[in-house]
């Protein structure tokens, strides 16, 4: 641009004149800006692709590591070979062990893996025992205490379970006790003196992890016990609680990593009903027992029949259906119903009573005398059904439980396996029924979202419940990394009974749900944009309601629920949690996978055939918000 000056009389004029080079400069600048914007767009797309590739690489790396771990375990030593080496007679103490088993515990023979674990710890080997619920884990440390004529320290998270075991041991003439906040000064003094006396007849001391972590006096007494040669074994019950990758991590278990260093030469025995390879490796690392022997029982309980039932839309319908099932299939037989909350327990128990079923609720907020009364009434048979939270079950010794019903979705496959495993301990046929619907996912996710692997564990449970085409035992075997063929199930699950139990997806029709998925995302976007401040978030239940209306005539509510579950599990949608003063609310938002979705590739979902039992009127109203109230 150039400036010209000319005058007319005494007046001077300044004129700006645009030159050709100036015009060229503006055009060039505009062109460069356009190119820059295009490059930014391409870079953004590449960033998204890189992000997607990184996630894919992470998934493949995890799969590779899992396969490598399996190869390593198989190469080093087959678990059956390890078990065979230890699960036999011929050890110096074998005859005495059998004698104690029969004369002290009044048992005729060892259960699977009990003898192997006993022989290992008597040989001063560290070991981890994975035995299903009711498999007899407690004998693995109780008998060695008597066999070694010394002290077994038992770390257990539940005082109630500890007290039950102590009563049982004392009835067998075995001196044992616990040290906790309820222990009298006289009893505490007696125990402390006993565990530091090598000639004492005291055999088992039960403590919680908190007790060890907070009591220097306790640790000092145990060191003295070791110095006089009296401490023979440290057993850690529910050892999966050590792992942050587990389904029930407890921070107080972190202190236990000092035990191996502090009590050198004392074998550590970890016990649990469930543990994946990841959890098992983490537990061993945390406790410093990387070379520990592993004794793992197979996951399969052949006498248990697994079923998943579409949960009715209203609570009244649900309890009515449960009552009908109990009356029709389990008349006069003992059972457990697990609920998510204490409120649910009380409501379900009350509803069952109205149907003439002898039921009683059980949860941690009851007075101890009421809780004990419910427990004893159920054990004695006066109460047919106990309706409980997860507070009920650990250490329960009732072999003739014929059914376990889950009123709501458990938080992990491990929890489900352990809780359902309380059925049929006598080896006779028993049934495990899981009632499942979309709303339960959001109630449970609001509770577990702060746990390190809470959502991951929950979604694994959802995959089990939502898959109506794969053998239930195949799903369990995959999770616990065991080999399983659907034919071995013998129609002992609902999918195999219906002829659907297969492995893979190729043999079952899949439906292209791309358009329905796009409609789902549009609803979320419209809801979000409807609020000027961007606060128009949508809950899962509301999304189902709107999607069902949108697809009215072509798809029913059941399809919409299954679609949303599928999109959540595949990462096209995700949950977003928000806190209020009294609750945690789950909202459904667009997931990372949708952000890189090109809109062309087909999104497929396995075909759903609506069964007669599912052709019920589902409530279209949002009966329960996706909210978990904070107590």
Swiss-Prot record:
<dbReference type="InterPro" id="IPR001763">
    <property type="entry name" value="Rhodanese-like_dom"/>
</dbReference>
<dbReference type="InterPro" id="IPR027417">
    <property type="entry name" value="P-loop_NTPase"/>
</dbReference>
<dbReference type="GO" id="GO:0005524">
    <property type="term" value="F:ATP binding"/>
</dbReference>
<keyword id="KW-0539">Nucleus</keyword>
<dbReference type="Pfam" id="PF00271">
    <property type="entry name" value="Helicase_C"/>
</dbReference>
<dbReference type="Pfam" id="PF16124">
    <property type="entry name" value="RecQ_Zn_bind"/>
</dbReference>
<dbReference type="GO" id="GO:0016887">
    <property type="term" value="F:ATP hydrolysis activity"/>
</dbReference>
<feature type="domain" description="Helicase ATP-binding">
    <location>
        <begin position="118"/>
        <end position="293"/>
    </location>
</feature>
<dbReference type="GO" id="GO:0005694">
    <property type="term" value="C:chromosome"/>
</dbReference>
<dbReference type="GO" id="GO:0000724">
    <property type="term" value="P:double-strand break repair via homologous recombination"/>
</dbReference>
<feature type="domain" description="Helicase C-terminal">
    <location>
        <begin position="318"/>
        <end position="466"/>
    </location>
</feature>
<keyword id="KW-0547">Nucleotide-binding</keyword>
<keyword id="KW-0347">Helicase</keyword>
<keyword id="KW-0479">Metal-binding</keyword>
<feature type="region of interest" description="Disordered">
    <location>
        <begin position="610"/>
        <end position="631"/>
    </location>
</feature>
<dbReference type="GO" id="GO:0046872">
    <property type="term" value="F:metal ion binding"/>
</dbReference>
<feature type="short sequence motif" description="DEVH box">
    <location>
        <begin position="237"/>
        <end position="240"/>
    </location>
</feature>
<feature type="binding site">
    <location>
        <position position="496"/>
    </location>
    <ligand>
        <name>Zn(2+)</name>
    </ligand>
</feature>
<comment type="function">
    <text>DNA helicase that may play a role in the repair of DNA that is damaged by ultraviolet light or other mutagens. Exhibits a magnesium-dependent ATP-dependent DNA-helicase activity that unwinds single- and double-stranded DNA in a 3'-5' direction.</text>
</comment>
<dbReference type="GO" id="GO:0005737">
    <property type="term" value="C:cytoplasm"/>
</dbReference>
<protein>
    <recommendedName>
        <fullName>Putative ATP-dependent DNA helicase Q1</fullName>
        <ecNumber>5.6.2.4</ecNumber>
    </recommendedName>
</protein>
<feature type="compositionally biased region" description="Acidic residues">
    <location>
        <begin position="622"/>
        <end position="631"/>
    </location>
</feature>
<feature type="binding site">
    <location>
        <position position="489"/>
    </location>
    <ligand>
        <name>Zn(2+)</name>
    </ligand>
</feature>
<dbReference type="GO" id="GO:0005634">
    <property type="term" value="C:nucleus"/>
</dbReference>
<keyword id="KW-0238">DNA-binding</keyword>
<dbReference type="InterPro" id="IPR011545">
    <property type="entry name" value="DEAD/DEAH_box_helicase_dom"/>
</dbReference>
<keyword id="KW-0378">Hydrolase</keyword>
<feature type="binding site">
    <location>
        <position position="471"/>
    </location>
    <ligand>
        <name>Zn(2+)</name>
    </ligand>
</feature>
<dbReference type="GO" id="GO:0009378">
    <property type="term" value="F:four-way junction helicase activity"/>
</dbReference>
<keyword id="KW-0413">Isomerase</keyword>
<dbReference type="GO" id="GO:0043138">
    <property type="term" value="F:3'-5' DNA helicase activity"/>
</dbReference>
<feature type="binding site">
    <location>
        <position position="493"/>
    </location>
    <ligand>
        <name>Zn(2+)</name>
    </ligand>
</feature>
<keyword id="KW-0067">ATP-binding</keyword>
<dbReference type="InterPro" id="IPR001650">
    <property type="entry name" value="Helicase_C-like"/>
</dbReference>
<dbReference type="GO" id="GO:0003677">
    <property type="term" value="F:DNA binding"/>
</dbReference>
<dbReference type="GO" id="GO:0006260">
    <property type="term" value="P:DNA replication"/>
</dbReference>
<dbReference type="InterPro" id="IPR032284">
    <property type="entry name" value="RecQ_Zn-bd"/>
</dbReference>
<dbReference type="Pfam" id="PF00270">
    <property type="entry name" value="DEAD"/>
</dbReference>
<feature type="binding site">
    <location>
        <begin position="131"/>
        <end position="138"/>
    </location>
    <ligand>
        <name>ATP</name>
    </ligand>
</feature>
<comment type="similarity">
    <text>Belongs to the helicase family. RecQ subfamily.</text>
</comment>
<dbReference type="InterPro" id="IPR036388">
    <property type="entry name" value="WH-like_DNA-bd_sf"/>
</dbReference>
<dbReference type="InterPro" id="IPR004589">
    <property type="entry name" value="DNA_helicase_ATP-dep_RecQ"/>
</dbReference>
């Amino acid at each position: 641009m150039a400036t010209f000056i000319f005058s007319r009389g005494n007046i001077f004029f300044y004129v700006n004149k645009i030159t050709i080079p100036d015009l060229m400069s503006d055009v060039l600048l505009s062109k460069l800006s356009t190119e820059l914007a295009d490059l930014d767009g391409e870079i953004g797309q590449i960033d998204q692709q890189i992000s997607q590739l990184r996630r894919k690489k992470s998934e493949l790396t995890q799969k590779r590591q899992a396969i490598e771990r399996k190869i390593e375990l198989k190469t080093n030593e087959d678990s059956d070979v390890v078990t065979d080496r230890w699960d036999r007679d011929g050890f110096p103490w074998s005859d005495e062990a059998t004698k104690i088993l029969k004369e002290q515990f009044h048992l005729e023979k060892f259960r699977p893996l009990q003898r192997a674990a006993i022989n290992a710890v008597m040989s001063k080997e560290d070991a981890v025992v994975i035995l299903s619920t009711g498999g007899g884990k407690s004998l693995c440390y109780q008998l060695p205490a008597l066999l070694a004529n010394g002290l077994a320290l038992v770390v257990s998270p539940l005082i109630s379970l500890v007290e039950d075991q102590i009563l049982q041991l004392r009835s067998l003439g075995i001196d044992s006790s616990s040290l906790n906040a309820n222990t009298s000064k006289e009893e505490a003094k007696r125990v402390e003196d006993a565990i530091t006396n090598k000639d004492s007849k005291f055999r088992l001391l039960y403590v919680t992890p908190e007790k060890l972590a907070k009591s220097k006096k306790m640790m000092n007494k145990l060191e003295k016990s070791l110095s006089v040669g009296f401490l023979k074994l440290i057993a850690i019950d529910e050892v999966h609680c050590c792992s942050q990758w587990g389904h029930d991590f407890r921070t107080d278990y972190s202190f236990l990593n000092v035990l191996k260093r502090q009590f050198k030469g004392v074998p550590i025995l970890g016990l649990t009903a469930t543990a994946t390879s990841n959890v098992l490796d983490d537990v061993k690392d945390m406790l410093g027992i990387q070379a520990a022997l592993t004794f793992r029982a197979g996951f399969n309980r052949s006498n248990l029949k697994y079923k998943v039932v579409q949960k009715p839309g209203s609570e009244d319908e649900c309890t009515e259906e449960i009552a009908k099932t109990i009356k029709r299939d389990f008349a006069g037989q003992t059972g457990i119903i697990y609920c998510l909350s204490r409120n649910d327990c009380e409501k379900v128990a009350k509803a069952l009573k109205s149907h003439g079923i002898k039921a009683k609720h059980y949860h941690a907020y009851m007075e101890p005398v009421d809780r004990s009364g419910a427990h004893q009434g159920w054990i004695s048979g006066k109460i047919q059904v106990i309706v409980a939270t997860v507070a009920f079950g650990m250490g329960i010794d009732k072999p003739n439980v014929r059914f376990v019903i889950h009123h709501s979705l458990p938080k992990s496959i491990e929890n489900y396996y352990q809780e359902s495993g309380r059925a049929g301990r006598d080896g006779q046929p028993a049934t495990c029924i899981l009632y499942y619907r979309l709303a339960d996912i959001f109630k449970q996710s609001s509770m577990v979202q702060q746990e390190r692997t809470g959502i991951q564990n929950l979604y694994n449970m959802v995959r089990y419940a939502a898959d109506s085409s794969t053998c239930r035992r195949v799903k369990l075997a995959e999770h616990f990394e065991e080999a399983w063929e659907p034919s071995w199930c013998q129609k002992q699950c609902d999918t195999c009974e219906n002829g659907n139990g297969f492995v893979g997806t190729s043999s079952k029709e899949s439906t292209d749900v791309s358009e329905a998925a796009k409609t789902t995302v549009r609803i979320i976007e419209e809801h979000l944009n409807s609020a000027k401040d961007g606060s128009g978030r949508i809950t899962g239940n509301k999304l189902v309601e709107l999607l069902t209306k949108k697809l009215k005539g072509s798809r029913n509510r059941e399809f919409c629920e299954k679609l949303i579950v599928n999109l959540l599990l595949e990462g096209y949608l995700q949950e977003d949690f928000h806190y209020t003063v009294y609750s945690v609310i789950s909202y459904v938002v667009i997931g990372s996978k949708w952000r890189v979705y090109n809109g062309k590739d087909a999104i497929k979902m396995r075909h759903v055939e609506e069964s007669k039992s599912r052709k019920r009127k589902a409530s279209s109203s949002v009966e329960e918000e996706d909210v978990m109230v904070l107590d």
